[in-house]
Every structure is written in C-alpha cells, then in structure tokens.
C-alpha cells in the first residue's frame, strides 16, 4: 500500500470504530469503476474490516454479477429498475449467477431513482419481498429529483423527502432494507433524520455507507467530513495510478517516434 492508501485505511478504521461506517461503495454504472480500481478498493476495505457495496451496470448485468461473486461483494445494487418486469429480470439474473447458498452472504437491492419506479413501487415491493426476491431498496435522490425536472438545489426539499418517506413505509411493511443516498451532506441531515423517524436501514455518500443509527450520533457531521476526505484521497490515488501508467511508455514512445521519423523521412502522425 502507498502513503495515500494508508491514509484511506486509517479513515475507514476510524469510520468503522466510532462513526457508524459499515461499507465502502463502488459503481460499475455511473462512476464507471474499472476492475483494477475495484481490486484496490476491496483490499483497503477488507483491511479495515469493512463491507463492499457495488452498483452494477443494469438489472440484467450478468458479467457484473459474475465479477461481484468472484470478488466477494457484500451489497449489490441494480440501477434504474423502473418496472415490475425490470425487477423480475434482476431477480432472475441474480438467481442465475448466485446459488441460494451463495446469496446468504450477499444482499441484493434495487434503486428507486425515478418517478416511474415510484409509480410502480407498491407492486415492486411485493415482488421484492417474495422468497427468492431481493433484500432491499435504495432511494437515489439525485436521479429521482432529475426525473421530476428538479435540480440538485431541490434535493433537500420536503417534496423529495416526502417521496422518500412514502417509499420507506412500503419497505418497512415489506420487511426490506431501506437505504437513502444522493448528494448527502450536512445539509441533508434534517431530511435523513425525518426519514429515519419512519424507517431507514442505512444511508450513503458517494463512497461510504453508514448505519442509519449514526444519524443519532453527536459526531455525524465529522463522519460526513471523513467520508469526503476518503473520496478525495481515492480520486487522488486513482489519478496518480493512471499517471504512472501513462509515464511508463512515454520514453519508449519518444525513442520509437524519433527512429520512425529518421527511417521513414516523414512524421508518424
């Protein structure tokens, strides 16, 4: 591990020990996490005794599910599941890749991130809670707001919070885990606490997932700052990693290009 990764590990240990942090999160979907990046994240998380959550590329992303199983992901989230049929395809896909025994150590969740999903939510919660269904749902506030034509500045309004609470009540009735994420910051705390008063299992920033009870802690704002610190270090570490790869071949490229120009008498490009 390099110096930056050592700092990241220290943050994760701190979050787990006294801030309610339970998992690190990556995305094959919007974030476009590459497999080598994911391996680095997994190693750091495992050393901190943290779980791994991964948002796959879609409801029927078989390849992503296979890689998730090989890596040993703890939470798998399917994005943009907007209809009962899409949810059934996710359930079919995870049952194809994971045996019932293998599913015992993994939680499968679907995203509630558009108004279309919300309009189908009662039927979808029933499907999700079937014996071979899924374990929970994640309310994604950013895309949900966007699906209503609202900007990020309106994410913390009562309108979005009310939708999240309605979904929370249905998840509670269905005995499913319920997670809220999307632009989570100190400004989000009143909204999250209101949702938590009804039902909430976990909440998440871009890279860190917290137990919902962390909202009752006096150091919750510090927890969110540490989550930002971790994400920033992760991005800096990723940038350095690819800069090193880029520099690896630069000298060889310069030498070969000069040789080409001399031998051919023309520019390569």
Which positions does each model-derived feature cover?
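Expand to "…catalyze enediolate/carbanion chemistry for C-C bond making/breaking, isomerization
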Residues: 1-269
């Amino acid at each position: 591990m390099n110096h930056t990764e050592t700092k990241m590990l220290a943050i994760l240990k701190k979050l787990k020990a006294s801030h309610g942090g339970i998992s690190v999160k990556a995305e094959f979907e919007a974030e476009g996490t590459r497999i080598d990046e994911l391996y680095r994240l997994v190693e750091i998380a495992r050393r901190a005794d943290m779980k791994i959550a991964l948002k796959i590329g879609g409801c029927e992303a078989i390849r992503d599910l296979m890689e998730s199983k090989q890596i040993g992901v703890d939470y798998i989230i399917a994005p943009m599941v907007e209809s009962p049929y899409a949810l059934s395809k996710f359930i079919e896909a995870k049952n194809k890749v994971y045996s019932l025994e293998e599913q015992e150590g993994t939680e499968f969740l679907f995203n509630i991130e558009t108004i279309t999903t919300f309009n189908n939510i009662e039927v979808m919660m029933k499907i999700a809670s079937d014996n071979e269904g899924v374990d929970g749902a994640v309310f994604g506030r950013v895309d949900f707001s966007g699906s209503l034509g609202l900007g990020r500045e309106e994410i913390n309004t009562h309108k979005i919070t009310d939708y999240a609470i309605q979904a929370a009540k249905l998840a509670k009735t269905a005995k499913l885990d319920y997670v809220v994420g999307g632009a989570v910051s100190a400004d989000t705390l009143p909204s999250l606490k209101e949702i938590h008063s009804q039902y909430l299992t976990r909440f998440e920033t871009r890279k860190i997932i917290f137990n919902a009870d962390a909202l009752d802690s006096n150091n919750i704002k510090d927890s969110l700052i540490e989550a930002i610190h971790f994400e920033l270090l992760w991005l800096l570490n990723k940038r350095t990693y690819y800069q090193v790869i880029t520099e690896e071949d630069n000298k060889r490229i310069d030498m070969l290009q000069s040789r080409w120009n001399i031998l051919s008498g023309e520019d390569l490009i």
